[in-house]
């Protein structure tokens, strides 16, 4: 059974939208399965890539993303939150890091017969380790434990 977020992520990948799954879904893909309310993605911030993203989002849920434009995706910290079947947070910069900075720190998973990139444990730890959020601290601890288990 495909979840709504799996369908959307596969759709974005098929359309050649350049993105990396970050946040709770990436933590789960690295082996620490936990619930998460949203899906976080970091996108490459070129106008062409954002246009592909927006084209694919027009059919997402009720289609509220049709109201977005390329200008809504600024090169600054913070996410554009799109709430449809689930909340989707779209970042162009996350903790000072851009898509180009993190693409080398990704792994690939197969969703609906298409490869989708997600952030590896080391990079996730780097993004989350200075966070004040309790969930981020739990994630860092769990990811470090998983890394320690894998290295022994």
Give residue ranges: language-model regions.
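Compositionally biased terminal segments of proteins
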Residues: 1-152
């Amino acid at each position: 059974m495909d979840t709504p977020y799996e369908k959307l992520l596969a759709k974005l990948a098929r359309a050649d939208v350049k993105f990396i799954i970050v946040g709770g879904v990436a933590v789960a893909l690295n082996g620490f399965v936990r619930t998460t309310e949203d899906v976080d993605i970091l996108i490459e911030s070129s106008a062409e890539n954002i246009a592909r993203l927006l084209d694919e989002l027009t059919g997402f849920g009720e289609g509220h993303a049709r109201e977005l434009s390329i200008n809504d995706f600024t090169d600054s910290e913070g996410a554009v939150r799109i709430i449809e079947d689930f909340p989707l947070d779209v970042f162009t910069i996350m903790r000072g890091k851009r898509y180009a900075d993190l693409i080398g720190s990704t792994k690939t998973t197969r969703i609906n017969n298409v490869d989708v990139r997600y952030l590896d444990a080391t990079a996730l730890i780097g993004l989350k380790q200075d966070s004040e959020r309790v969930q981020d601290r739990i994630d860092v601890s769990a990811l470090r434990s998983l890394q320690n288990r894998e290295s022994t």
